[in-house]
């Protein structure tokens, strides 16, 4: 076998990248001819495909799933779905995950050489307290959830209480969330790139904690089977039965009618008491009632807050 045949066979067995390098090396040894020497282009590495955007439920599940670590995944998934359906922090989760999605590549590249990578769960460890979202250890008891053993021996997730819960947050954008996470201990090597990204107006995801008008807020509560309007009134008050009727009316009804209790069929006592509660959180009597639903003050916990 000639040397040329041997070279050709060896060349044919080389990977594509090494073939290009071998051809360029051979061409470099050739004497210059009348025309330009043709170079074989190096293979161009493809840019990594953009990663899927993380939505609020993905973040919620990542953060709270360890609450049920004793169960197999088959049992955990229904629990997480139930909790998400009743979670009061959907806007906050969507916001935290939107910010993470926009800077995800920078965060993953930043600490590539460190033992502690900035994963979604690690990011949420810092973002959750900044946003005022309930921590993992307090979530179930604060919102009235418990794991209950059923008569057949299975364990089910049940809501055994309906605590009143208030949240009071300040307006925040993505850059503000990131800097507050850094103040809380988040370490990012290439923070200048993240700051530049979040400072770009096209990526400035604003999350407003806008207070709704009192009529709008209580209209939503009236449309919720979990927050009946009767919760606004003093216990055992004479107009409580009328309040139960209010809770059965749909939201469009209130948007058309305007103020609560102004339509015919409700007693003057009902109108006076409800109007007073919605305006300033004060009933006309000295009886106690759930002020957390009627006042714009930060409250958290059971029965109007602690």
Swiss-Prot record:
GO terms for molecular function: DNA binding, bending. It is found in: Nucleus. GO terms for cellular component: nucleus. The keyword ATP-binding does not apply. Its main location: nucleus. It comes from the Eukaryota. Residues 49-104 bind DNA. Signal peptide: none annotated. Keywords: DNA-binding, Nucleus, Transcription, Transcription regulation. PROSITE patterns: ALPHA_BOX. The keyword ATP-binding does not apply. GO terms for biological process: positive regulation of mating-type specific transcription, DNA-templated. InterPro entries: MATalpha_HMGbox. Belongs to the MATALPHA1 family. Mating type proteins are sequence specific DNA-binding proteins that act as master switches in fungal differentiation by controlling gene expression in a cell type-specific fashion. Transcriptional activator that induces the transcription of alpha-specific genes. This is Mating type protein SmtA-1. It comes from Sordaria macrospora (strain ATCC MYA-333 / DSM 997 / K(L3346) / K-hell).
């Amino acid at each position: 076998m000639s040397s040329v045949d041997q070279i050709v066979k060896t060349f044919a067995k080389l990977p594509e990248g090494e073939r290009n390098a071998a051809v360029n090396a051979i061409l470099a040894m050739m004497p210059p001819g009348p025309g330009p020497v043709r170079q074989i282009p190096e293979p161009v590495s493809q840019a990594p495909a953009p990663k899927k955007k993380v939505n609020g439920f993905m973040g919620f599940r990542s953060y709270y799933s360890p609450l049920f670590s004793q169960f197999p995944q088959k049992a955990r998934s229904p629990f997480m779905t139930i909790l998400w359906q009743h979670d009061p922090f959907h806007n906050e989760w969507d916001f935290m995950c939107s910010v993470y999605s926009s800077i995800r590549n920078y965060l993953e590249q930043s600490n590539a050489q460190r033992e502690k990578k900035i994963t979604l769960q690690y990011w949420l460890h810092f973002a959750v307290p900044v946003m005022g979202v309930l921590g993992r250890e307090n979530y179930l008891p604060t919102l009235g959830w418990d794991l209950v053993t059923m008569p057949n021996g299975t364990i089910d997730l049940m809501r055994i209480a309906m605590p009143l819960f208030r949240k009071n947050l300040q307006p925040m954008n993505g850059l503000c969330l990131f800097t507050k996470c850094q103040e809380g201990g988040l370490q990012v090597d290439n923070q200048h790139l993240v700051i530049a990204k979040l400072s770009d107006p096209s990526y400035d995801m604003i999350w407003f904690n806008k207070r709704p008008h009192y009529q709008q807020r209580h209209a939503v509560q009236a449309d919720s089977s979990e927050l009946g309007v009767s919760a606004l009134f003093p216990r055992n008050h004479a107009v409580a039965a009328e309040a139960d009727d209010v809770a059965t009316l749909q939201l469009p009804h209130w948007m058309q009618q305007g103020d609560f209790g102004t339509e015919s069929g409700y007693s003057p006592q009902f109108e006076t008491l409800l109007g007073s509660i919605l305006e300033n959180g004060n009933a006309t009597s000295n009886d106690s009632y759930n002020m957390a639903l009627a006042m714009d003050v930060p409250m958290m916990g059971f029965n109007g807050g602690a």
